[in-house]
């Protein structure tokens, strides 16, 4: 298996099914966890020096922090309903407690925090929805925590790729601290597949090909993108979902397309406008 794939496992005693830390990934900023909680189960964590974005992938929950409480949040029972999720932003030096009101799949997105912003609910109505690309590189985007919304480090977005389509395409990268042209951002991809016995294909490669891996990704896999371009393909018969977490020294998403393939987007958009 590729060193960039972290596979999910059966829930442990606290419900965790996958975990990425900066230490385990060999980088500095991004952490990511998923919990599969049964109805009535409770998860309690301190954020310490990290901020967190709790994304309710599916199911309903009560969530409270040190100063805030939200009851009976959650709307979708499956990510492929394509309804924007409920999420909760939690600053560093805080605590969160999640009580599952139904079986619950919860993503915990983590990055360094400074305690600048208070805890808040991010309801579906505040999630920006857009269609990006055209033709067989068109995909649906849910901007959960974009750079236009307050946070210290985190950027969080989910993407739906129709069967037979590509996303994160044209291949792009954000691994150089070269503003305003490109920002350095580490990134995780948490994949789900419908039907769940299918697979996605993801490539991670650099200009000099010091990294050049093409991976078969299963349902529940996390792909690490420390640097390089990272396109995704959904084979016929299977639609893909992924939740992206990004963070780096500056909270901005400035990317560079692979110049060999940048023309594809222009070609697809031109065909769409005809």
Swiss-Prot record:
Question: What general EC class does the enzyme of this chain belong to?
Answer: isomerase
Q: So what EC number does this one have? A: 5.3.1.30
Recorded GO MF terms = 5-deoxy-D-glucuronate isomerase activity; glucuronate isomerase activity
Gene Ontology BP term (one) = inositol catabolic process
The reply on keyword Ubl conjugation is no
Pathway linked to the protein: Polyol metabolism; myo-inositol degradation into acetyl-CoA; acetyl-CoA from myo-inositol: step 4/7
Q: Which domain of life is it from?
A: Bacteria
Q: Which reaction does it catalyse?
A: 5-deoxy-D-glucuronate = 5-dehydro-2-deoxy-D-gluconate
Keyword annotations for this protein? Isomerase
Q: Does the keyword Isomerase apply?
A: yes
- Name the Pfam families for this protein: KduI
Which family is annotated? Belongs to the isomerase IolB family.
Its job: Involved in the isomerization of 5-deoxy-glucuronate (5DG) to 5-dehydro-2-deoxy-D-gluconate (DKG or 2-deoxy-5-keto-D-gluconate).
Would you tell me the protein name for this molecule?
A: 5-deoxy-glucuronate isomerase
Origin organism is Geobacillus thermodenitrificans (strain NG80-2)
